[in-house]
A protein has these predicted regions:
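Absolute protein N-terminus
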Residues: 1-2
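Loop/turn positions that initiate beta-strands
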Residues: 5-6
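Short beta-strand-centered aromatic/proline hotspots
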Residues: 14-24
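Well-ordered beta-strand positions in beta-sheet-rich domains
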Residues: 15, 34, 47-49
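Short, solvent-exposed secondary-structure boundary/capping segments
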Residues: 24-36
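A short macromolecule-binding patch
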Residues: 38-52
């Protein structure tokens, strides 16, 4: 259960703030409670109403500073699984983005970065698909880490690099 003014992760929308919890009558199910949320970093005019018993879209509390620092410190030790089949790799990436689990997102980013370095060494570039997945994962990581660590979103990547170097 979440409370008013909590910051949460809501699906792939990233960080949202619960601006209210309301009850409304619903023709089909009677009286029902809803979280009223607003994205923190994207369109601030967007307001979303979600049933408090929502099971369809992933929602969770933000990580703590301690949990984030632990994830950052563990980045050098992450084992990267290479998936050779493009379709399987794409499905895996979609699953990771949908889960919004920071440990998996950092693995995805690290894996794509390694793949990018390998390709650059032979004069090739990342595919548009991999670039898009990397951007989506970085957006989720950057926004959650920025909110919890109270730093600007654009400073998150350098913050991470400073702490793993």
């Amino acid at each position: 259960m979440f409370n008013k003014n909590d910051y949460i992760i809501y699906g792939s929308m990233s960080v949202c703030k619960i601006i209210d919890i309301i009850e409304e009558d619903n023709v089909y199910v009677g009286r029902k409670s809803y979280y009223v949320i607003r994205p923190v970093y994207s369109d601030k005019n967007t307001i979303i109403k979600i049933p408090t018993d929502n099971k369809k879209v992933f929602m969770r509390h933000l990580l703590s500073q301690k949990e984030i620092m632990s994830i950052i410190e563990n980045i050098p030790n992450l084992e990267i699984i290479k998936i050779e089949n493009d379709k399987e790799r794409s499905m895996h990436y979609k699953s990771v983005i949908k889960s919004s689990i920071c440990e998996e997102l950092t693995e995805l980013i690290k894996g794509i970065n390694i793949n990018e370095q390998d390709k650059l060494s032979i004069g090739k570039k990342l595919s548009k698909t991999e670039e898009d997945f990397k951007k989506a994962a970085e957006k989720l990581i950057d926004e959650e880490f920025a909110t919890v660590l109270n730093i600007p979103v654009q400073d998150v990547q350098s913050f991470i690099l400073d702490h793993i170097s």
